[in-house]
Structures are given as structure tokens and as C-alpha cells.
Regions:
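C-terminal beta-strand-rich structural cap/linker in extracellular carbohydrate-active enzymes
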Residues: 167-185
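Loop/helix patches that line or flank the sugar-binding groove of alpha-linked glycan CAZymes
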Residues: 1-133, 139-145
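Flexible, charged surface loops at secondary-structure boundaries
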Residues: 127-129, 149-150, 174
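A conserved amphipathic helix/loop scaffold
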Residues: 137, 164-165
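Short helix/strand-capping connector loops at secondary-structure junctions
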Residues: 71-73, 159-162
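A short acidic, often aromatic-flanked loop/helix-cap motif at beta-alpha or helix-coil junctions
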Residues: 54-55, 161-164
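Beta-strand-rich binding/interaction modules
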Residues: 143-161
Length: 185
């Protein structure tokens, strides 16, 4: 779901009221920097359940406390449920994997030495009893090749399921891709 920028002058948030005297161009400048938010209402808009007038958050006859995001007609839970590649289904798949994979929520965690790789890569290994997983996250907009993965890796989850990240020489991570590998201990 997307955040909806709301002018400080219409803020319901008490913190936002403290800054309502600021000119809108200054608010936009501060908000764009990403370092601070003057209006917490931006991320408190009603959940977008469907394409109806109030996004399915409340009946059409009721006015919600905050306005719905203008994009709610196309970006909502109902439309994401039907899209296998949606962020909603990505999270559901990750939660299911976490539920059935003890190493993802218990045991030890060790950060992989990536000193010879891009600073945009984060990798860590989780081990619980005899189960081990290796997580690789590419935070860059570029394809990145990694070193060879030890432990007979197999893909348990990928944010880009149509790709095969395991190559003979290591991993080939697509831009902004995350991969969970099952590996032997």
C-alpha cells in the first residue's frame, strides 16, 4: 500500500499541528530529505482493502478519520491477492517459510564476510540444530555476482521467483533481490 501525503494544515496528528504554520514548500523540502517527518498522518491513512469509495475500510456512508490514498482503486489487498508477484503475496510466502523453517526464527546468526563484495550486499547464516539457511540481500540497482556458496545450496525463497540465482560460480543476484537458501551445516 502507498502512503498518502497530507498537508499539515489538515493534519489530525497533534505533532503535525505544531508545524502547521510552516509554508508548504518548506514542509515538502524537509519531507523529501527523508530525515524527518512532520506529519505522522501520512502513514496512518485507512487500510486499502478494496476499490470502493473508502477502500473497504468503512462503509461508503461513513467518512473515515483520514482520507484514503488516491491510488486505492488499483492498489489494494483485493488486487494484490490475485497477483502472484505482489508484495502482499511475497510477505505471505516469507511468513509461511519462516513458520516451517526453525532456522529462520531460532538458533544462531552469523554475518557473512562480504569484504570482497559490494557494500550493497548483506548476507547472513542462520543455524538451528541441523538446519541452516543463508540469506542474501542485494540493496543495489545492479546485478551482483557473489562468491561460491558452500553447503550444497538450494533456493527456498526468492523475491524474483522466475530467476535462478544459483550459478556454478556462486550467486547472481538481480537488482534489489533477496534470496533464502537452504544449505547443509
Amino acid at each position: 500500500m502507498s502512503n498518502h501525503r497530507l498537508p499539515l494544515k489538515t493534519a489530525k496528528d497533534p505533532i503535525g499541528h505544531k508545524f502547521s504554520w510552516l509554508p508548504q514548500f518548506l514542509v515538502n523540502l524537509v519531507t523529501r530529505s527523508g530525515s524527518i517527518s512532520l506529519n505522522r498522518d501520512d502513514c496512518r491513512t485507512p487500510m486499502q482493502w478494496g476499490p470502493s469509495i473508502n477502500a473497504g475500510f468503512c462503509s461508503d456512508e461513513v467518512e473515515p478519520w483520514l482520507p484514503t490514498s488516491p491510488g486505492h482503486k488499483s492498489l489494494n489487498v483485493r488486487s494484490e491477492q490475485n497477483d502472484q508477484n505482489s508484495l502482499l503475496n511475497c510477505y505471505k510466502s516469507l511468513l509461511l517459510l519462516r513458520k516451517k523453517t526453525p532456522a529462520l526464527h531460532s538458533g544462531s546468526l552469523s554475518i557473512t564476510d562480504n569484504s570482497n563484495l559490494s557494500k550493497s550486499i548483506l548476507s547472513y547464516r542462520r543455524i538451528h540444530n541441523e538446519q541452516a539457511v543463508q540469506i542474501w540481500l542485494n540493496f543495489s540497482g545492479k546485478q551482483i555476482h557473489t562468491k561460491e556458496i558452500e553447503g550444497n545450496p538450494r533456493v527456498l525463497f526468492s523475491t524474483i521467483p522466475e530467476t535462478t540465482p544459483i550459478k556454478s560460480h556462486g550467486l547472481l543476484l538481480q537488482p534489489y533481490q533477496g534470496v533464502v537458501l537452504g544449505v547443509s551445516t
